[in-house]
Amino acid sequence: MIDRREILDAAAQTSLTPHVVEKDYVLGWMLAGISRHAELADNWIFKGGTCLKKCFFETYRFSEDLDFTLRDAGQIDETFLKRVFAEIGERIRDETGIEIPAQLQEFEILQNPRGKTMCQGKVSYKGPVSSSHGLPRIKLDLTADERIVLPPVRVQIFHPYSDAPEEGIEVLAYDYVEAFAEKFRALAERTRPRDLYDVVNLYRNVEARPEPGPFAEVLRAKCEFKGMGLPCLTDLEPHRADLEAGWVHMLDHQLPALLPVASFWDELPEIFAWLAGGRSPVLTAMPIGSENVVIRDRIVPLPTGARGQAFIDLIRFAATNHLLVEIDYVDKQGVRSTREIEAYSLRRSKAGDVLLMAVRAADGQARSYLLEKIFGVRPTQKSFRPRYPIELTPSGLQSIPRRSSASFRLGA
């Protein structure tokens, strides 16, 4: 098990509580245990918000539960689940020291509104910062009552901790487009704060955005399975007040900074226009920095002792969420001051310097900032509408999709 200090340091860097970071750490090892279990590896398909965070976008909100679609409905059985999770817990304890007491596991077998069997589980754990009393729990949602439209994919999860296996942790997960479509359907079904946050954030990632026609095919298939039509904006309007009331309570602890709900709701007309086949606005390239190379590395090579990586992670989060970020910066004249910026990309100059390409919020001027001259970074709660393409999504460890294919082969 990693040291307590590693969790505390990660919490400080991400502006989250140690318990949220610890849960993310344990979730990674729980996924490892599930994916390595012979009876589950090819039968459990990972989906939902935690899937989006762990498999596709590391700058996504931290999520707290594990959702799976099961190929074998017979595995939704209390006796079976208690046995396999006792086995998973033993293996995780032996490999990491994380304690997952078998006697504290709960699996409630229920029927969904369609009369099909489902399971809501709770798995307790003791990690690096957990107390011995009132152990935290991971929630499990298991169903076999779902149509899998696209072939699932094998994905390496994001597990940025020092005890990560050399070979990584690979899981069977929804195709990105299907994960996006199921979130869109959930927004129409439940209109919960996290569903709105998820759909808007997925849409904002222009590089991964599917073509609207094929995406609508997948969404239509997912909706038809539930007896729903293709969602429209008017379906959501009656739920707006409840969504606004729960916005902070549901999301604030999962994010370093939270935008006002209006900045998400106001983007829905554009999203539904895109779904109907409309063309999304095309942003022009930033007027400066084109001669420099865009940096896509998840971990950016920096001089020994440099503070920059933690700053980069916060900048990426802010940019992805369209939040202004406040930087503490020393300019060419040696003057140190703070300023709010819109962050767009990291680039490496011909001299080898790492530059943050941004727009100064005060006057709208494009600027470049030497990363080594940044002494502090703080995401604000002020939103901005991008003027230029945001090129801060890292590539490499995770299966970040790039402009999803224009055609899909729909499954059975």
List the predicted regions and their residue ranges.
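Structured mid-to-C-terminal alpha-helical surface segments
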Residues: 1-44, 54-66, 70-304, 309, ...
